[in-house]
């Protein structure tokens, strides 16, 4: 067995290297509680499921509570959402942030995945490249914000891009899923916004997902029964998946588990200032 990441899934799914999940004896009923998009990503061109994930990676807008209180008058997620409810409102709020001395995002690249997850069709159709209207809106909105110095053009994961994880970076928001919040925003580093529990989360202009890891069975494996057992335990056992949420603050690929955790008033995120963001 081996693991694949979302951006590289098709490289392996549409090959003979990956074994059909059904050939392991795993049924549609076994996977009934999983989010459909996690299946779609690892379904090959013939409609065959080739991998299973324990993760769901829906993304949210992650904002600085201190900046929200200073500029918007409130750090309540519902109030902040009003200022970022759609892209036109988002870009208008960027002007307000700039006047107050803050960048709306660290980079124009922060919003790309949100726009690109909301296109109406594939990049290549009938052998021709098709640029979706939502991609062009990202280009137009981003150029406007960069020209107005409301954001920058840093590469994701670069040192300059990461400066916004700290108060001196003067960045209002990032976009990301659960893994981004706890594992990528310097939560373990003294002085970071995450370490102080001063980020908040709200839906943002559009829903999106980012990343995820899938378990695949290698074609020809002589450990098929073991691979089946690992996949079923890791991706379908509600108790195990609930423990993953509680222990790691991850978002798991199990609808009943996530619905229960979203309604659990005892669950909260330290990084997000005690907020339970799972109902979004």
Feature-to-residue mapping (PLM):
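C-terminal lobe and pocket-closing loops
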Residues: 183-193, 205-280
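Solvent-exposed loop/turn segments at secondary-structure junctions
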Residues: 6-11, 57-60, 67-68, 110-113, ...
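Extracytoplasmic/periplasmic substrate-binding proteins
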Residues: 9-11, 137-229
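Hinge/lid segment of periplasmic solute-binding proteins
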Residues: 4-60, 88-91, 194-203, 269-270
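A conserved hydrophobic position in a structured secondary element of the catalytic/binding core
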Residues: 4, 63, 176, 222, ...
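Helix-loop-helix "hinge/cap" segment bordering the ligand-binding cleft or interdomain interface
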Residues: 25-30, 40-111, 123-156, 219-225
